[in-house]
Amino acid sequence: MSDKLLVINPEQKPHSRGTMVTQSLYEHAGGDDGLHRLEELFYEKALIDPVLRTQFTKRVPTHVDHLTWFTAESFGGPDRFTRELGFQYLIDVHRHLENITDEQRERFIAAYMEVLDEGGMPDDERFRQAFREHVEFGARVAQQNSRAETDADVYPLHEVPHWDWPDER
């Protein structure tokens, strides 16, 4: 048996017992550094985008960090968003936004997808699919919560959702 590691899939890494385990989306995206770079690019785009800038009216110094923490935790990284801010923070922030329109929700998704390459994110199909599904879900939840008039109208999610690789088809 050879001592060389056979890498079958770039999304896998060696397990300590010699078996292969799948890398988390967080690790695959480059961890905090990769996700922070991506969130910074998205945020810069949102601040000047004619459709999104009514929701992103001014630069908030902590916003990129909060976006990074949320995505990192969702993708299997540290639970910093939950520890530092608590999930209720996310609900409260979106409930105070002006009602998010369908056009804004769609543009939000498109803006994220547009910065993936510039942000140096992996271009494999499964990562891009997982990322798109994550952003689409988040945009739908944010839109619903922005329109909530009562607690009963808020999307019934009480913790940062954990995202994983899509099933192989």
PLM regions with names:
Residues 2-169:
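Core of compact, soluble alpha-helical bundle domains
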